[in-house]
Amino acid sequence: MAETAPAAAPAAAPAPAAKAAAKKPKKAAGGAKARKPAGPSVTELITKAVSASKERKGLSLAALKKALAAGGYDVEKNNSRIKLGLKSLVSKGTLVQTKGTGASGSFRLSKKPGEGLEKAPKKKASAAKPKKAAAKKPAAAAKKPKKAVAVKKSPKKAKKPAASATKKSVKSPKKAAKPKKAVAAKSPAKAKAVKPKAAKPKAAKPKAAKAKKAAAKKK
């Protein structure tokens, strides 16, 4: 029993060592936070230097480095950061490259950094307007069939004049038949008027008889 007790004590020793190892990363993380440089970033310094320049054609890379060095920035150590910062600002649209390619050349600020953001919503609003117009077009298209129904009704109206025309055509023979009756009625009257004219010579015969009687008396 006395021999096993000392063996248990070394086994319990690794547990405090593990706790100490777990605490060390926290201290390392705190050291990393302390290493971060306090103050503005490279991009902020570049934008301030470019905005401070009054050159119309833009600020060259050499002039930019001079301005950053005058502000206390270590240009030689952070040369690669300056180039990366310039490229990122050009890609975002905050800076415009007037000369050269890549990080070399001249740079100037865009007219208004917020213009790009303001124009985007306007484009979205203009894109939304055609949708509303497209929504109105189907409604107009739905109304058009009603006009087509009105056009279908119009042939019915056209049929009515055709029916009236047939009625008139039926009535017209009756009117044409009436003058025939009138002509037939007038012709007997003319015939009657002719007969009395023929009867006048018959009336002259008695006068001749009277003349013969008067002559006989004279004898």
UniProtKB/Swiss-Prot annotation:
This is Histone H1.11R. It is found in: Nucleus; Chromosome. It holds the Pfam family Linker_histone. PROSITE patterns: H15. GO terms for biological process: chromosome condensation; negative regulation of DNA recombination; nucleosome assembly. Histones H1 are necessary for the condensation of nucleosome chains into higher-order structures. Residues 38-111 form the H15 domain. It comes from the Eukaryota. Residues 1-42, 89-219 are annotated as: Disordered. One of its GO terms (cellular component) is nucleus. Keywords: Chromosome, DNA-binding, Nucleus. One of its GO terms (molecular function) is structural constituent of chromatin. Residues 121-135, 143-160, 168-183, 192-219 have a biased composition (Basic residues). Belongs to the histone H1/H5 family. Residues 1-20, 28-40 have a biased composition (Low complexity). InterPro entries: H1/H5 (IPR005819), Histone_H1/H5_H15 (IPR005818), WH-like_DNA-bd_sf (IPR036388), WH_DNA-bd_sf (IPR036390). SMART domains: H15.
